[in-house]
Protein backbone atom coordinates (compact mmCIF):
# COMPACT_ATOMS: atom_id res chain seq x y z
CA UNK A 1 0.00 0.00 0.00
CA UNK A 2 1.28 3.44 -0.95
CA UNK A 3 -0.04 6.51 0.89
CA UNK A 4 0.19 9.82 -0.99
CA UNK A 5 -0.39 13.40 0.19
CA UNK A 6 -0.55 16.43 -2.13
CA UNK A 7 -2.27 19.79 -2.49
CA UNK A 8 -3.47 19.54 -6.12
CA UNK A 9 -4.26 16.52 -8.33
CA UNK A 10 -4.74 16.37 -12.10
CA UNK A 11 -5.96 13.00 -13.27
CA UNK A 12 -6.70 11.54 -16.67
CA UNK A 13 -6.79 7.95 -17.85
CA UNK A 14 -3.09 7.74 -18.79
CA UNK A 15 -1.42 10.18 -16.36
CA UNK A 16 -1.65 11.22 -12.75
CA UNK A 17 -0.11 14.56 -11.78
CA UNK A 18 0.27 15.70 -8.17
CA UNK A 19 1.53 19.16 -7.23
CA UNK A 20 2.72 21.15 -4.23
CA UNK A 21 4.18 19.47 -1.19
CA UNK A 22 3.79 15.93 -2.55
CA UNK A 23 4.74 13.22 -0.05
CA UNK A 24 4.34 9.47 -0.24
CA UNK A 25 4.89 6.59 2.13
CA UNK A 26 5.28 2.85 1.74
CA UNK A 27 7.00 0.72 4.36
CA UNK A 28 10.14 0.24 2.23
CA UNK A 29 10.28 3.61 0.42
CA UNK A 30 9.27 7.19 1.15
CA UNK A 31 9.48 10.32 -0.96
CA UNK A 32 8.94 14.05 -1.15
CA UNK A 33 8.87 16.56 -4.02
CA UNK A 34 6.82 19.46 -5.30
CA UNK A 35 5.70 17.85 -8.58
CA UNK A 36 5.07 14.16 -9.27
CA UNK A 37 3.83 12.71 -12.56
CA UNK A 38 2.94 9.05 -13.09
CA UNK A 39 2.59 7.86 -16.67
CA UNK A 40 0.52 4.66 -16.86
CA UNK A 41 1.65 3.83 -20.42
CA UNK A 42 5.33 3.43 -19.57
CA UNK A 43 5.07 2.87 -15.78
CA UNK A 44 7.31 5.85 -15.11
CA UNK A 45 7.20 8.19 -12.12
CA UNK A 46 8.74 11.63 -12.66
CA UNK A 47 9.64 13.67 -9.58
CA UNK A 48 10.64 17.34 -9.89
CA UNK A 49 11.39 20.34 -7.69
CA UNK A 50 13.69 19.20 -4.89
CA UNK A 51 12.83 15.49 -4.98
CA UNK A 52 14.05 13.23 -2.18
CA UNK A 53 13.64 9.45 -1.90
CA UNK A 54 14.38 7.39 1.20
CA UNK A 55 14.90 3.65 0.64
CA UNK A 56 15.91 1.71 3.75
CA UNK A 57 19.00 3.56 5.12
CA UNK A 58 19.62 5.51 1.91
CA UNK A 59 18.59 9.01 0.89
CA UNK A 60 18.58 9.74 -2.86
CA UNK A 61 18.37 13.21 -4.40
CA UNK A 62 18.87 15.01 -7.70
CA UNK A 63 17.40 17.95 -9.55
CA UNK A 64 14.97 15.36 -10.95
CA UNK A 65 14.30 11.70 -10.24
CA UNK A 66 12.76 9.29 -12.76
CA UNK A 67 11.55 5.93 -11.43
CA UNK A 68 10.79 2.89 -13.61
CA UNK A 69 8.19 0.62 -12.00
CA UNK A 70 7.76 -3.07 -12.94
CA UNK A 71 5.10 -5.27 -11.36
CA UNK A 72 4.47 -2.71 -8.60
CA UNK A 73 8.11 -2.59 -7.51
CA UNK A 74 10.93 -0.21 -8.43
CA UNK A 75 13.13 -1.54 -11.23
CA UNK A 76 15.51 1.41 -11.52
CA UNK A 77 15.81 5.06 -10.57
CA UNK A 78 17.62 7.81 -12.49
CA UNK A 79 18.77 10.89 -10.55
CA UNK A 80 20.08 13.80 -12.62
CA UNK A 81 21.71 16.27 -12.65
CA UNK A 82 23.38 16.86 -9.28
CA UNK A 83 22.71 13.30 -8.14
CA UNK A 84 23.55 12.49 -4.52
CA UNK A 85 23.07 9.28 -2.54
CA UNK A 86 23.68 9.27 1.21
CA UNK A 87 23.63 6.16 3.36
CA UNK A 88 23.94 6.33 7.12
CA UNK A 89 26.85 4.10 8.14
CA UNK A 90 26.67 4.78 11.86
CA UNK A 91 25.54 7.57 14.15
CA UNK A 92 28.55 9.59 13.01
CA UNK A 93 29.31 8.39 9.50
CA UNK A 94 27.63 8.73 6.13
CA UNK A 95 28.61 6.85 2.98
CA UNK A 96 28.13 9.19 0.01
CA UNK A 97 27.94 8.87 -3.76
CA UNK A 98 27.77 11.98 -5.93
CA UNK A 99 27.79 12.63 -9.68
CA UNK A 100 26.11 14.32 -12.60
CA UNK A 101 23.86 11.29 -13.09
CA UNK A 102 23.32 8.18 -10.97
CA UNK A 103 21.20 5.21 -11.98
CA UNK A 104 20.23 2.93 -9.09
CA UNK A 105 19.09 -0.60 -9.95
CA UNK A 106 16.81 -2.39 -7.50
CA UNK A 107 16.37 -6.06 -6.61
CA UNK A 108 13.67 -7.16 -4.14
CA UNK A 109 12.92 -3.47 -3.35
CA UNK A 110 16.53 -2.78 -2.29
CA UNK A 111 19.33 -1.03 -4.16
CA UNK A 112 21.46 -3.74 -5.80
CA UNK A 113 23.93 -1.57 -7.68
CA UNK A 114 24.45 2.00 -8.89
CA UNK A 115 26.10 3.40 -11.98
CA UNK A 116 27.55 6.87 -11.41
CA UNK A 117 28.33 8.92 -14.54
CA UNK A 118 30.12 12.25 -14.77
CA UNK A 119 32.38 13.71 -12.08
CA UNK A 120 31.76 10.65 -9.91
CA UNK A 121 32.79 10.96 -6.26
CA UNK A 122 32.40 8.74 -3.20
CA UNK A 123 33.14 8.80 0.47
CA UNK A 124 32.66 5.58 2.37
CA UNK A 125 33.57 4.38 5.80
CA UNK A 126 35.73 1.27 5.46
CA UNK A 127 35.26 -1.22 8.29
CA UNK A 128 36.76 -4.61 9.11
CA UNK A 129 34.68 -7.72 9.85
CA UNK A 130 34.04 -6.79 13.49
CA UNK A 131 32.77 -3.31 12.53
CA UNK A 132 35.89 -1.41 13.63
CA UNK A 133 36.70 1.60 11.47
CA UNK A 134 39.74 1.12 9.22
CA UNK A 135 39.46 4.54 7.62
CA UNK A 136 37.45 6.77 5.34
CA UNK A 137 37.91 6.29 1.60
CA UNK A 138 37.68 9.28 -0.77
CA UNK A 139 37.49 8.52 -4.48
CA UNK A 140 36.92 10.33 -7.76
CA UNK A 141 36.69 9.11 -11.34
CA UNK A 142 34.79 9.79 -14.56
CA UNK A 143 32.37 6.91 -13.88
CA UNK A 144 31.85 4.27 -11.20
CA UNK A 145 29.97 0.99 -10.94
CA UNK A 146 28.98 0.43 -7.31
CA UNK A 147 27.74 -2.91 -5.96
CA UNK A 148 25.56 -2.98 -2.86
CA UNK A 149 25.17 -5.95 -0.50
CA UNK A 150 23.09 -5.92 2.70
CA UNK A 151 22.45 -2.17 2.18
CA UNK A 152 26.20 -1.43 2.26
CA UNK A 153 28.75 -0.67 -0.47
CA UNK A 154 30.50 -3.97 -1.18
CA UNK A 155 32.56 -3.15 -4.29
CA UNK A 156 33.36 -0.16 -6.51
CA UNK A 157 34.85 -0.29 -10.01
CA UNK A 158 36.36 2.99 -11.19
CA UNK A 159 36.73 4.07 -14.82
CA UNK A 160 38.99 6.89 -16.14
CA UNK A 161 40.77 9.65 -14.23
CA UNK A 162 40.89 7.69 -10.97
CA UNK A 163 41.96 9.31 -7.70
CA UNK A 164 41.55 7.44 -4.42
CA UNK A 165 42.80 8.09 -0.89
CA UNK A 166 42.18 6.22 2.36
CA UNK A 167 42.46 8.35 5.50
CA UNK A 168 42.66 6.95 9.03
CA UNK A 169 40.02 8.66 11.20
CA UNK A 170 42.63 10.58 13.20
CA UNK A 171 43.91 12.29 10.02
CA UNK A 172 40.53 13.80 9.11
CA UNK A 173 40.10 17.55 9.26
CA UNK A 174 36.83 19.41 9.87
CA UNK A 175 34.10 18.49 7.37
CA UNK A 176 36.41 16.25 5.32
CA UNK A 177 33.92 13.44 5.80
CA UNK A 178 31.28 15.24 3.68
CA UNK A 179 31.17 15.76 -0.07
CA UNK A 180 30.24 19.25 -1.28
CA UNK A 181 26.44 19.53 -1.33
CA UNK A 182 25.90 17.03 1.51
CA UNK A 183 22.47 17.53 3.10
CA UNK A 184 20.99 14.83 5.36
CA UNK A 185 17.22 15.41 5.39
CA UNK A 186 15.95 12.82 7.87
CA UNK A 187 13.82 15.51 9.55
CA UNK A 188 11.52 15.87 6.49
CA UNK A 189 11.18 12.15 5.77
CA UNK A 190 7.48 11.19 5.53
CA UNK A 191 6.21 9.07 8.43
CA UNK A 192 3.21 6.71 8.43
CA UNK A 193 1.35 8.80 11.03
CA UNK A 194 1.23 11.76 8.58
CA UNK A 195 -1.15 9.91 6.27
Language model segments and positions:
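Structural signature for solvent-exposed beta-strand/loop edge elements and short helix-capping sites
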Residues: 1-195
